[in-house]
Amino acid sequence: FHGTEDALQQNVALEYERNGERYSFLKWAAQAFKNVRIVPPGAGILHQVNIEYIANVVTGREINGELCAIPDSLLGMDSHTTMVNGISVFGWGVGGLEGGTAMLGQPISMLIPDVVGCKLIGELGPASTPTDVALTATQMLRDHGVVQNFVEYCGPGLDEMSATNRATLGNMSPEYGATMGFSPIDTKT
């Protein structure tokens, strides 16, 4: 359904009608396993839901009597999971088997990738947008060759960008072939 005021409600109702049994199973799984969190249909697009509801930049936990800061990480079954990199969360997309394995508490393994720094300088001009920066960075990183690398953004230009704008950079990681496009933790995240 589209083009009407109640299109969202109609589409969500249709989703429940078509996938009710699956949603019942997922609801059970969320209660049965501590590492499974289910976001209901209609809550939004996955990579935006990750930022708004799931990802925590840092979690405090007491370990051996000391409070420790633990940076968050997130695996998603969507290539644009990397959007969370803009809020300083270490995350990327994986296949269904890897994602299911991780949800059940098993570790995933990967080769340690090369890390490529991308230094941003200057500020956005009045006629420029964060998307312009992301598209320019995408072209430059493609030309450099960063397939399966971690890209870390840095520099004074990054300092000028909001977390929302950094999320645009992270979201483009699949377009330049990197595993992720990470913005480090700072006062904006």
Where are these regions (language model features)?
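Fe-S-dependent hydro-lyases/dehydratases of central metabolism
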Residues: 1-189
